């Protein structure tokens, strides 16, 4: 099996053609397209950009809220000189499931909307001709998939997505599509692990190939080769190594080759950063030095393109994070586009990488009442759907770690977001996931999950598996909001005193906290939703953080306003952003800039 999640690279032995652009598009509400032959000829004149979500491009609500099957179609040309190579199609992501057809022949099926997949089409394509590429996608939700939800049928027969999560269920081909020509024998994967020495660094590596020929690995600093080794496993010894660090990212070029005599059979290039990351004595240590995390939970979300990859937006986001003094973000609530990790590698940002395990709670109302402990809840991990959910969860976790394990920016894995984890089935569900993450990751990064507001130190059955505890807390907003901030602060301290008793030397970070603010809303005296109240809340919350030495990070919710399912508690989306959806600062951005640019990197470093 030649499955590979390596990022597409053009080299002396590999060829790439990008297939992004305007494709043809059609909804298929009756799911009749396969039987009607749409894989060979899509009967539609609609055009659709790739990558992008389709939802916000239309002007009618039925199209925006469409739930069910939908089709994309384009054509691609295969050069005659590619004959004799393996021809592979590679999708960055299709939300949430996809069936892929080439010239009417089904070549791939994939479940999961946030990770890449590929299809080998060597024996199906026609060389020196145009070929038809069709994708049948589906955006329905269920309790066995990640993220979790359900699909309802309205009185008029239309389906509608009912997510258990608080972000909009954007759908489409969201990331780049590549046509690749690869050598028959090739590099399928590689991994690295780092050790710092008195004279530099050592890089232990493992290379996976699909053939018998020998492998060499070289490391370059610019045009200078600084280390080399041979074999599918080995060690690169780097003298006077330049380390990758926060906002001081240094990247080396890694070159992996397969040789047959004097010929190079395959060549794969990547950029890596030499760094170590560990937890010791209740602190996060980057290259052996303490680092206090400060930054954001985010979303892949923007006007018009929805969740589709948009490089200008990516660039703007990183410039804003640098301006405000952030050093970290969580990929809430799913793995992001690979290009975002590459940018983090280059800019020196730390990433907590999160699998799309969100919506793992249920309430008779919605996510918000469940978050407050209102409504009837049942254990989410004691249902008939749990075995299938766990299987899909393991598959997504495996793909995320396989894809992202070599990024220096990735410092930790988040295995779930806000699961209902106080019931008896929690431990049986959590244990194999945490064991799998440890087994798959050669760097043994710390593992965590974000703890729901109703999961407390004495009731959470999952926190014992985490290498560090991550709390989502809203004292002063969802709990005791408004004029009673003093009560919110007292309740917050009470809970924190409880966590102090169960951490057993582990650090704790906040992966969510914040309030909604309608940009431009000012009130004197303050009221909820105003800029003044948002700042008062943040000052109170930060004072609580600073009171506890074991608090080692703060990732505010959210970087920018983002879209959600419409409802009476959401005014055209979630407004907790420190920046607007158009990436302009709210008043709170200046509060964070003042705090984060003055906090030392090793804030709260002392620990005896």
Per-segment meaning from a language model:
Residues 1-343, 347-351, 396, 411-412, ...:
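Secreted/periplasmic carbohydrate-active enzymes, especially glycoside hydrolases
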Residues 204-206, 318-320, 328-595, 604-605:
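Substrate-binding/catalytic cleft of secreted carbohydrate-active enzymes
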